[in-house]
């Protein structure tokens, strides 16, 4: 047991997840005035319920990426956590300081068609409010996982995995706007946040930061 705890002591990072969920769902329950996010471009993006598939695949994608690096490479896992958790915290702060939402969702009852995908989407619309949307965490986390995969030395020659991750990331980003879960504005700022977080997590000149972070918390390793 002691050897196991020493090997996987970086599991302490997982403690962030209950904190994040507590804060996120707390913000979801707020009764406040929301800034409506919209763009003229949103009107030109077609609604397509089929995109509910990559939208839900996001959960498996993030979990699988997280688990892979947790068990295979402590350094890559630390960099992924630095990227995701810092960015997600920034999103929470934005949602708290600048409450936002959108009114893009179609009325599924008058859509004129019903299928397994519209029923899945109806469930999503029921459980997930149209608030706290900008920046898009779906976009941000997908890009973060894709970057982690592309930056992994162990996956450099795994073309199928790399191309699959890229295509899935693009599909997830498209799903957020094609399902009218997000405005194109939310996706844009999710991408901007990804670019910002790339600097401390992966830029070569700053690459030592996660390693220094790990050493600073060496008591947990």
PLM region spans:
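N-terminal transmembrane-helix/juxtamembrane module of multi-pass inner/ER membrane proteins
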Residues: 1-63, 112-113, 121, 220-221
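Membrane-embedded alpha-helical segments of multi-pass membrane proteins
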Residues: 18, 54-61, 137-144, 188-192
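Aromatic-anchored segments of alpha-helical transmembrane domains
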Residues: 21-23, 88-97, 167-177
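Membrane-interface loops
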Residues: 27-42, 70-160, 208-221
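Hydrophobic, membrane-inserted alpha-helices
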Residues: 61-66, 142-148, 167-175
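Interfacial helix-loop-helix junctions of multi-pass membrane proteins
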Residues: 109, 129-134, 171-198
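Short hydrophobic alpha-helices at membrane interfaces in multi-pass membrane enzymes
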Residues: 157-170
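C-terminal membrane module of polytopic membrane proteins
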Residues: 183, 189-221
